[in-house]
Swiss-Prot record:
Keyword RNA-binding: no
Active site annotation, chain numbering: 23, 100
Species whose genome carries this gene: Ruegeria pomeroyi (strain ATCC 700808 / DSM 15171 / DSS-3) (Silicibacter pomeroyi)
Chain residues that bind substrate: 74, 80, 87, 101-102, 111
One of the protein's GO biological processes: chorismate biosynthetic process
Family under the similarity heading: Belongs to the type-II 3-dehydroquinase family.
InterPro entries associated with the record: DHquinase_II, DHquinase_II_CS, DHquinase_II_sf
Role description: Catalyzes a trans-dehydration via an enolate intermediate.
Coiled coil: none
Protein name according to UniProt: 3-dehydroquinate dehydratase
């Protein structure tokens, strides 16, 4: 079974209670459960990990090589600041789909810049928790023989 890592960055452990008007009321546990179930329905094994620490996220990306075939990444605020995450993604040569619950392009100007997007397969934002499932679908299609490039 194809294995995918779903990686959540800083403050995503507070989903459901942190700014629900922006991020919704779905908790991280609910997101993870939905990702695992959705992945199974697509023939994917899904592992989920959250950290508030940039180095731990870099370590998780490095450790994914040889274990997982792709990564769904919501880097949170590190999207806009972390060259380390960008370099980690480039170094493992795995397809990454960047996810954001809110539409980062419709928010504050500093959120319009993503250091992840240039090294990602694609970006999904503004669809709430559904964005994670869309990202899993995108990776499944990309990794299928028909989606190979």
């Amino acid at each position: 079974m194809t294995s995918i890592l779903v990686l959540h960055g800083p403050n995503l452990n507070l989903l459901g209670t942190r700014q629900p008007e922006v991020y919704g009321t779905t908790t991280l546990e609910m997101v993870n459960s939905a990702c695992i179930a959705h992945g199974q329905s697509r023939g994917l094994s899904v592992a989920c990990l959250q950290s508030n620490h940039e180095g731990a996220l870099v370590d998780a990306i490095h450790a994914a090589k040889g274990v997982h075939r792709g990564i769904v990444l919501n880097a949170g605020a590190y999207t806009h600041t972390s060259i380390a995450l960008r370099d980690a993604i480039s170094s493992v040569e795995l397809p990454v789909v960047e996810v954001h619950l809110s539409n980062i392009h419709a928010r504050e100007a500093f959120r319009h810049v993503s250091h992840i997007a240039p090294v990602a397969l694609g970006q999904i934002c503004g669809f709430g928790a559904q964005g994670y499932l869309l990202a899993l679908d995108a990776l499944a299609a990309h990794l299928s023989p028909e989606g190979a490039r």
